[in-house]
Amino acid sequence: TEPTLLKSVGSVTTHFNFEAYANLSRQWGKHDLNTTFMYSMDKIKSKGRNTGRAFMDVIGQAHYAYNNRYLVDLSLSGSASSILDPDDRWGIFPAIGAGWILSEESFLKNDWLNFLKLRASYGVSGRADYAVNLFQDIYGSGGSYFFKNAPTSMSGMKLTQLGVEGLTYEKSHKLNVGVDFKAWNKLSLAVDAFYDHRTDILVAGGNAVSGILGMSVPNVNDGVVDNKGIEIALNWDDKISNFTYHLGGQFSFVRNKIINQNEEY
């Protein structure tokens, strides 16, 4: 018998990651300032496959406290992803937070109150965990075609995927207010109320393109969803003689509302 020749095409994937950060802290009088700057790069490449992707993040954070009572946090990040449309690869995401530790105020100093803090924050974040090459038009084998009076057909190319126009980050605009409370060195309570407004969610494109085209309609960043709710955590920690025990419970209520998912009317 004649030998059978087998040919296997392998793939080598390389993953390169680089991170760097710098931290600067300063204290003067009743002031406390801490700043952090971070840079990260992540690159993944597979030899022989068009699935390579790269990500970059530049982040700056600052925390300021006055007299251990009044707190302010600022954050600004810039993110880039090769998965996105070349004109929309960079996203800017700011955030701000503030807190007030009331238990440090003289008018609330007492033996039974251990800790009481009011806090609020607002920030924008983005995610882009999409498939590679969604923004590109892709061509593939188009089957057999006859040219003029030729008796045999010939293979050709056709458009198999319409790229997502303006593919960008899905964004989350989140507002949170809360209170942290601890008393008698035993009881602790945390209450959070939040509102999350998500925009640019990738959803089906609907009937934006006629079915005569012969391919699936590309998705679009048109989805909008609102989430709001409240979360409560209550804990009790105590000790009786040599016996230590913990009791705790959590309650959460969340309401979700779809504002837009590019539905057909």
Task: Name the predicted role of every residue range.
Residues 1-265:
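Extracellular/periplasmic, surface-exposed regions of secreted and cell-surface proteins
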